Amino acid sequence: MLGFLRPLRGRAWHAPVPDLEWNCEETLRHLINTQLWYAAHLASRSTRRLAVWRDVDPRLDVDGLLDNLEAHISVLAAVIRDAPPEARSWHNSGMTDPCGFSAMACSELLVHTWDIGRGMDAPFALPGDLSARVVSRLFPMWLPIDTAPDQALLWCNGRVALPGRPRLGPDWGWWSRPVEEWDGTDPDA
């Protein structure tokens, strides 16, 4: 994602992102916040929502924001690597394991990089193998999805419609708890 975003530094980061309430810079700031928020929760094994400081310094330019994104991704990756598989921490979609935090972070990074690309008219190609793993981990309630993995991930995140499947509304959700705990029902139903 950083390899895609860094060359866009000179573009208009205040450009709106289609179908979001944020512009490109606000979407980038959200990405930075999610990585730190996930890391803080998993590292602490909190059973409740933490009041994690989430606002990136408003004075940072795009280069500074991208550096922060890289740093926050690295912190989260280290926390995930060091967490035992049985670790759990709070997320509004349930007590989440390291694999769930990893999948949520990947979903955020892939989909919001795609969003930023749309806002800047610079198409971002989601990697199919990673998209498939994220879909199978976070969205077991909708499997199988008979389409390309990148389109499946975008559909699961409410970004596109698929043949025979209308675009999901803003209240879509994912399964962040261990897949073994899923009872076969749609958590949003």
Q: What label would you give each PLM region?
A:
Residues 1-8, 25-44:
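Alpha-helical bundle segments that constitute or directly flank the non-heme di-iron/ferroxidase center
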Residues 7-16, 20, 40-52, 64-71, ...:
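Structured surface interface patches that mediate subunit assembly and partner/cofactor docking
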